[in-house]
Amino acid sequence: MNSITIAPAAEYSKDYVTVKNQIHILYSQAIVTFLFPVIAACCLAWFLWGVAYRSFLYVWLGLVFFHALARYNLLWKYHQTGIAPDNAGIWLNRFLASVFSSGVIWGVAGMVLVPYDSSIEYTLYNGLTMLITCGLVSGAMISYAINIWVLVAYSFPALVPPAIYLIWLGDYYNSAFGGFILLYYFFIGVAAARMNRQFNYYVEMELQQKEIKYRYEKLQQVYSDYRKRLRQ
């Protein structure tokens, strides 16, 4: 007696279902998450206008706006194309690249916008810059924790290099502030790992549901074909 093997369809595979859910959540919230850095950059530029290097500030603001336009163009192309098994990895990598570049832009802000000069309150102005960056990272963690690599690609360049830079400056307050930023980065990493495990659990449950549905549909088809052969 011949056995019947029911292979899962590509759209029901575990890897595809996981990536598809991640992409859907990342891009569905991107309309708002892509806008926040622009608003934050404008507020920061207004506050730092009197103390920042003007040339650096102009270039940095230009990069923020250009990057936002590029991300919204990416979002528009995504909605025009959609997700399929053959392009899911591409859309995830594109989003990964966009958040990494955003993290670099904000990490640079904490190192070059405010001059380390005794004539200005460097710790105050740079502290506000890092406070805004930490706020953006913590807000993004809610969306980006579904994929640990996406969160790391954004948070690491945004927080770790400026934290190391503050420690490297050597004075008591800035070094302590840099250490607290690294501690904060550790805390959000632990929280993100827990959120990611919960997400993977729900994806596993959804995958099992889809596999059962797929096998049931295939069995119905096999049963229907078998009845047709009996009637012949």
Residue ranges and their predicted role:
Residues 83-99:
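Juxtamembrane helix-capping/reentrant segments at transmembrane boundaries
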Residues 13, 26-82, 163, 182, ...:
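Hydrophobic alpha-helical transmembrane segments of multi-pass membrane proteins
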Residues 189-203:
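Short helix-terminus and kink motifs of transmembrane alpha helices
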Residues 16-27, 85:
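Cytosolic juxtamembrane amphipathic/interface segments immediately preceding
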Residues 197, 204-232:
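Amphipathic alpha-helical coiled-coil "transmission" helices that mediate dimerization
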Residues 1-14:
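Short, charged cytosolic
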Residues 96-190:
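Hydrophobic transmembrane alpha-helices
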